[in-house]
């Protein structure tokens, strides 16, 4: 689809048929957990703040072709295939799949921190065939979270796309060994076919990955500034859509990983043209690039450790963060506890009884 589900091209290392995990080098992972910011610019004055929160995730009319500069370390969706059309009277078992991020490389290491990747499994009772469906980054997690600073370009260069991947088979051992493989519902073939049409539309219009959830504080009911758009959100959207079609889910606990930044009210800075264009704010543009500099990939160990110190100093001491969301830049005045990884329960949806005959 979007060349991903429909044509089966793809990117990621798997165990067996396995599923995709957050894919970046260990250095990117550490940097992600430490956050990023380099001092050098404070909040812009005179630019009006947007008052409608959270900022809606922007959808697009079509998925653009990736720039050749963007290269994946692990091929996206290498065993992918088109979503099949099911017989209307087929009973399709639906499974919740969850395993530690980077499990293919680090085993259960990140599972102990509850940093998990989510996917969905299906089994046709008529054919006995199993399928896996997931949504993840085309060019690994680091590229979706931080840009490249190319010397020939004034603006940071982003290799950020996420997409759905569908392939035959479920790697039972992978999901069961360190994670979860549990049936959550049974749907009809008609519901599955309806879902397949929705997945294609969702995949063609929701094109970029967003790592961060940004809130005012960890307190319940605190203002949410920005929502993430990642593998777990795809699973949640799909489950909700199946419930709209009439699927009835089991009453079991389902938890998901979320990475939070905490800040005061964000300040809107502008898009690439208004910040980095011919009439842009050169001081602001330089500050943003300095902010992202510690996240350069493939740093030598000594330089990488120095970058971590810069990150710690910036986010803890200077309380600054620049967020790129909807292809626009925002300034976040960071607040304690700055960053937090949670493993929160989000209940399975309730069936729409008016559509249960599908």
Swiss-Prot record:
Variant or mutagenesis effect after changing residue 117 to A: Significant decrease in palmitoyl protein thioesterase activity
Enzyme Commission designation: 2.3.1.-, 3.1.2.22
Protein name as it appears in the record: Bis(monoacylglycero)phosphate synthase CLN5
The keyword DNA-binding is annotated on this UniProt entry: no
Location of the region described as Membrane-anchoring in the Swiss-Prot/TrEMBL record: 304-343
Disease: Ceroid lipofuscinosis, neuronal, 5: A form of neuronal ceroid lipofuscinosis. Neuronal ceroid lipofuscinoses are progressive neurodegenerative, lysosomal storage diseases characterized by intracellular accumulation of autofluorescent liposomal material, and clinically by seizures, dementia, visual loss, and/or cerebral atrophy. The lipopigment patterns observed most often in neuronal ceroid lipofuscinosis type 5 comprise mixed combinations of granular, curvilinear, and fingerprint profiles.
Function (record text): Exhibits palmitoyl protein thioesterase (S-depalmitoylation) activity in vitro and most likely plays a role in protein S-depalmitoylation.
Expression tissues: Ubiquitous.
Keyword annotations: Disease variant, Disulfide bond, Epilepsy, Glycoprotein, Hydrolase, Lysosome, Membrane, Neurodegeneration, Neuronal ceroid lipofuscinosis, Signal-anchor, Transferase, Transmembrane, Transmembrane helix
Active-site residue list: 117 (proton acceptor), 231 (nucleophile)
Pfam families attached to this UniProt entry: CLN5 (PF15014)
Result of altering residue 230 to N: In CLN5; creates a new N-glycosylation site; retained in the endoplasmic reticulum rather than reaching the lysosome; significant decrease in palmitoyl protein thioesterase activity
InterPro entries: CLN5
Keyword match Transmembrane helix: yes
The encoding gene: CLN5
Family: Belongs to the CLN5 family.
């Amino acid at each position: 689809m979007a060349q991903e589900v429909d044509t089966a091209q793809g990117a990621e290392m798997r165990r067996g048929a396995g599923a995709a995990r957050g894919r970046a080098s260990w250095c990117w992972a550490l940097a992600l957990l430490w956050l990023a910011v380099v001092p050098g610019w404070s909040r812009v004055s005179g630019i009006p703040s947007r008052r409608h929160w959270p900022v809606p995730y922007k959808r697009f009319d079509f998925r653009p072709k990736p720039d050749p500069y963007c290269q994946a370390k692990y091929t996206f969706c290498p065993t992918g295939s088109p979503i099949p059309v099911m017989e209307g009277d087929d009973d399709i078992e639906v499974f919740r799949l969850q395993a530690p991020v980077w499990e293919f490389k680090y085993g259960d290491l990140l599972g102990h921190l509850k940093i998990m990747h989510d996917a969905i499994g299906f089994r046709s009772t008529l054919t006995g065939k199993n399928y896996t469906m997931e949504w993840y980054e085309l060019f690994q997690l680091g590229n979706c979270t931080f840009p490249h600073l190319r010397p020939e370009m004034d603006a940071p260069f982003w290799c950020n796309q996420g997409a759905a991947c569908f392939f035959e088979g479920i790697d039972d051992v992978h999901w069961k060994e360190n994670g979860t493989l549990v049936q959550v519902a049974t749907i009809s073939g008609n519901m599955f076919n309806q879902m397949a049409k929705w997945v294609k539309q969702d995949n063609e219009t929701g094109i970029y990955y967003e790592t961060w959830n940004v809130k005012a504080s960890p307190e319940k009911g605190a203002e949410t500034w920005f929502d993430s758009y990642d593998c777990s959100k795809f699973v949640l959207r799909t489950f909700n859509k199946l419930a709209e079609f009439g699927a009835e889910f089991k009453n079991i606990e389902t938890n998901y990983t979320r990475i939070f930044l905490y800040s005061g009210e964000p300040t809107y800075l502008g898009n690439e043209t208004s910040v980095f264009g011919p009439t842009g704010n050169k001081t602001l543009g330089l500050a943003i690039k300095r902010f992202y500099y510690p996240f350069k990939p493939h740093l030598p160990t000594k330089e990488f450790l120095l970058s971590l110190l810069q990150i710690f100093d910036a986010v803890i001491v200077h309380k600054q963060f620049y967020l790129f969301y909807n292809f626009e830049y925002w300034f976040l005045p960071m607040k304690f506890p700055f960053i937090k990884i949670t493993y929160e329960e989000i209940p399975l949806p309730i069936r729409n009884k008016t559509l249960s005959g599908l």
